[in-house]
Structure formats: C-alpha cells, structure tokens
Regions:
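Periplasmic/cell-envelope proteins involved in peptidoglycan metabolism and beta-lactam response
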Residues: 1-180, 187, 196, 201, ...
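Beta-lactam-recognizing serine transpeptidase/beta-lactamase-like catalytic domain environment
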Residues: 55, 115, 158-200, 206-437
Length: 461
C-alpha cells in the first residue's frame, strides 16, 4: 500500500512538473487565443506595452486614452503587419496577441503588482523589442513583384534572430474593416510561417544530404540525363537533356531526372529519415512564434511517389521559414537552431524581463555533409541556376533555386523559390524567397534574394 501511495505521489509530481514546464515555455500559446477572456479583462486595467523593432522603431504602442496605435507610416505598418498583428486579435499569430503574456503584464511579479496597487499606478505591461528590422522589411515589400503573393524570410544564422518575416499581400492594422472585407486575398495569413508549399528543387538540398549521408562512392556517381526518367507509370522530366553528369553537375543544373534516379537508390526510409531530421513531420513548438508543420510522406511510397518527393513535389510541403532554417543548417555546419523573434523584454520599471529559452538546437546532418553541401550550393550561385543571386565585393552566396509546380481548380503554375545564405562570417544571413506562381526560381526569386541580402549588408544588421 505504501509503495502504491509513493507511486501515485510520484506520478502527480511528474504531471505537475510537466504542467509547470508547459505553462512556462508554451503558456503564450494558451494566452494568445483571441477568445481568451483573460486578454479582454487584462486590457481593461493594464496599459499594453510598446512593440519596437531591433533599431527602436515603434511598431505599436498604447496612447493616453488606452487606444492601441501603430506606426504613423503606412508602408511600415503594412510591411510588418503579419508580424505585429492587430489590436482585435484577428491575427492571433501576431506579436500583439501572441506576446500578450509580456505586453499585458501576465509575467509581472506579485511584487510589481503590489507596488502598482500601493502607489495607485495603473499597471503597465512590458515593452517588447523584436529582432526584425523595419527598414529591411519595408525594402523587401517595395521590391517584391507587384500583385504577387509570397514571402521572404531573412535570418542571422549565427544568432538565430529573424531579421525579416515578410508576407504578401499585406494589410493595414488601422483599417481592419478593409482587411476583413478582402479576406479572400489572404492578407491576414502569414505566408512565411503558415503557408505550406511544395518546395520544388530547393528540397534537393535534403535529398543531396541524404545521399551523402547514406550512399557510398558518390564521387564516382554518374547519370546520363536524357530529359526524362521513366518510373512506374510516369516519367519525371527536365526542360532539356543534360547528358552524362556527376552528382555535383546535377545539383548545379537542378536536374530532376538525376535526383529521381537517386531516390530509387535511397528508398523512402533513408530519404524520409533525413527529411525528418531536417524538421519535416516535426511539431515546431517554438517559444517566440507559431510555425505550421512541414510534411514529408513516410508511408510505403510507390516508386513514382518517391521520385516526385525527391524533387520536392507530390505530398512534400514546407513553409518558407522552415526552408530558411534548412539553409541555416548548412551554414551552421549541420546544426538546426530555434529561430528567435523576441530580442528583449523591458519591464515598466526599466528592468530586463527574463526571456524564454532559445537554446533549442540539434545536429541534423554531419559537419562533413554540411561542408560538401555548402560547396555545391556555392557552385549553384557561381555557375548554375542561381547565378542571379550572386553578390559583389567578395561576398559569397550559397543557394538553391526551385520552380515548384502547383495547381488549383483554375490553373497550373510554378512557385519561384530561392533558398540560401551568405557564406561570410561578417554577413551571416540566411534567406528564403517564395513568389507564388512566379515561374522560374532562378529568374524571379534569385534576383530578389540578391537585392535583399545586399540591403541587409548595407544596413549592417
């Protein structure tokens, strides 16, 4: 009986410990529900804190009347709209709602609240400094192809800070009636974190990593690309016949048939394992933001399904942020780190609020494989499909283009992708550019990546 009692006590303690852990690390997700009555209640007696970008530009604040206000510049408001959100909580993934735990004072200590009560001071929430750059975000918004949807993500792969998280189209938080009336346009959706797209040839980074990790003698690998590769009852095709190629040649030319053939040697178990190590099918429970889960089919795939998956088509789906993280993995020598959106939190008294941990990191590929991938991605930009992403002045860009077929009830198009990073220690920027139905990744996404990376360098972020 005593043993049973001890077991019950231990089980209760474990459940309580897990509950406390969940509240501390993921409590923001519970609080962030716009229908949470605690949020509306807290807004009645707490002055909501200020949101700024990394340079101190005010993105949102509360005026003397208690009304939530946003930056006076319309271009700025729109450029950061999905990151900041709105006062009504319609964009529940925006910082105004998701970080209400800070902004509305939920993390204030009992001593801070007692001090406010004794002095008769209205409680004020914490001020939150985000890692994004308003200047970079606005520049990306201006350069993005007009009337196109998509997203651009820029990360500092050394610090894990998100420098830009731009989604198109955008909305104005001061005019939510228009945003809601035009909801079909999807401006309230953050495509950088919530948009799930076939990654196309950018997924060849994952397939290449899997081959390097699992297949022997790849230095002697050669494949004769005739322009099509029959597999099952289908054929995987290329725009032209590349002839006999090494694996390095095939990656630089983004040869679909070579990677389709490579998938048959790998099999779905090895390729699926690498994809999952890289974050596919994983639950992204990040501290600072909500990111939808990318997917890779891991059931017993047919030969043709496996071939399509190896080139990022079929049932493979990823968010632009995830693909930027994959670029960061290569840049970081095979380690994936948790992205950071909150740079600092300051209390009403001027003190520093302890941040939630951003220490989550995991080795997902070996350092040797990452080094080989970097050299292959550099070749893509120097002489392959990503030449339009190249920078001058000694900056070396490593990258991969993609043109992912996508269809709806009305038409079939191609999403333009570029995924890569600057391989210089003094400019540690990783990037993902996605232009929905933009066509060629090399022609559309790569030039925007080049402009964006150059702007980040010029700003000294």
């Amino acid at each position: 009986m005593r043993l049973l009692t001890l077991l019950l006590i231990l089980m209760f303690a474990l459940v309580a410990a897990y509950f406390c852990y969940s509240v501390y690390f993921y409590g923001g997700r519970w609080i962030a529900n716009p229908y949470n009555p605690r949020i509306s209640s807290q807004k009645q007696h707490v002055v909501m804190g200020t949101l700024t970008d990394r340079d101190g530009t005010v993105l949102a604040y509360t005026d003397e009347s208690g009304t939530r206000r946003y930056n006076s510049n319309a271009a700025t408001r729109k450029a950061v709209s999905q990151v900041v959100g709105d006062s009504s909580g319609k964009v529940s993934t925006g910082a105004d709602t998701f970080h209400a735990q800070y902004l509305l004072g939920f993390r204030s200590s009992i001593f801070e609240r007692l001090a406010d009560a004794f002095t008769g001071t209205t409680q004020r929430g914490d001020d939150v400094e985000l890692t994004i750059s308003e200047r970079l975000s606005r520049y990306i918004s201006e350069q993005f192809p007009r009337d196109k949807r998509g997203a651009v993500v820029v990360l500092n792969y050394k610090t894990n800070e998100i420098l830009a998280l731009v989604s198109m189209p955008q909305f104005d938080p001061t005019d939510m009636d228009s945003a809601l009336a035009d909801e079909a346009a999807g401006a309230l959706v953050n495509r950088a974190t919530q948009g799930l797209y076939p990654p196309g040839s950018t997924f060849k980074i994952v397939t290449m990593a899997s081959a390097l990790e699992n297949l022997p003698d790849l230095n002697d690998f050669a494949f004769d690309c005739t322009g099509y590769y029959p597999v099952g009852s289908y054929s995987v095709t290329d725009g032209s016949a590349h002839g006999v190629q090494s694996l390095s040649d095939a990656f630089a030319h983004s040869c679909n048939t070579t990677f389709a053939a490579l998938s048959q040697d790998l099999g779905y178990e090895m390729l699926g394992k690498t994809a999952e190590e890289m974050g596919f099918n994983k639950n992204f429970m990040f501290s600072d933001l909500i990111v939808y889960n990318s997917s890779y089919p891991i059931d017993d795939l047919s030969a043709e399904d496996l071939a399509w998956s190896a080139i990022g088509q079929g049932r493979v789906l990823a968010t632009p942020l995830h693909m930027a993280l994959i670029a960061s993995v290569v840049a970081n020598g095979g380690v994936m780190n948790e992205p950071q959106l909150v740079k600092s939190v300051t209390t009403a008294q001027g003190g520093n609020r302890a941040l939630l941990s951003h220490a989550s990191s995991k080795r997902v590929i070996s350092a040797d494989v990452a080094a080989r991938l970097e050299s292959e991605m550099i070749r893509v930009v120097k002489s392959g499909t990503g030449r339009r992403a190249a920078l001058d002045n000694g900056y070396v860009v490593a990258g991969k283009t993609g043109s992912a077929e996508a269809s709806n009830d009305k038409s079939v198009g191609a999403h333009a992708w570029f995924v890569g990073y600057v391989a210089n220690d003094n400019a540690p920027y990783a990037i993902c550019v996605l232009v929905e139905n933009g066509g060629s990744g090399g022609a559309v996404a790569a030039p925007l990546a080049r402009k964006t990376l150059q702007k980040a360098i010029n700003l000294g972020l």
